């Protein structure tokens, strides 16, 4: 079983934490990760594209010219697809791009992604976040102290409201509640930062039959993951209300 050093926000070592083999020690399955990420990105598509067919385009009710005797080809409407201003033949219509992905495949993909980051030493564990007030400068200093470079995924718990507000303005940092941990966000960032609180929670989520967050991503923006981050979301809504005032 692999282990990782636990650091304080200032970068000092306070001990070590064991990484579960079934989460951070599996052989990465590239094809499964690809399929799950493809499904996640497909589920994010709005699918609202729409074109008008010949029957939906306004006008074109009168026959342009008589059927015979003009020497021209037969025409019944000016809204046929071959005409300028006519309808579109076989054009896109609104559709759902969501794909059904087995829960075991979702679980394997997330474990593969976390194992890949752990193998490269890109999983960092902090004992806890200590932000008295939200301050982005303190977040920048904390990332430098713990050695998080490049694109960083920071996984928060329910009570890390000030930390969430401190990190969320950084363009190279993606903030995520532990209940929303998913394959795409892990692979889309170079480093994954957990706290002692969120690390075991994350292991339990992956070890289950399937992660709730990734199942909801299949159905494109499910409310289930939002319910698990009520405290953080409520803090965001309070901020927006203050800005409007």
Each language-model region and where it sits:
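A short, aromatic/hydrophobic, helix- or strand-capping loop or linear motif
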Residues: 47-51
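Extended polybasic, low-complexity segments that bind anionic RNA or targeting/receptor surfaces
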Residues: 1-46, 92-245
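Glycine/serine-rich anion-binding loops at beta->alpha junctions
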Residues: 52-91
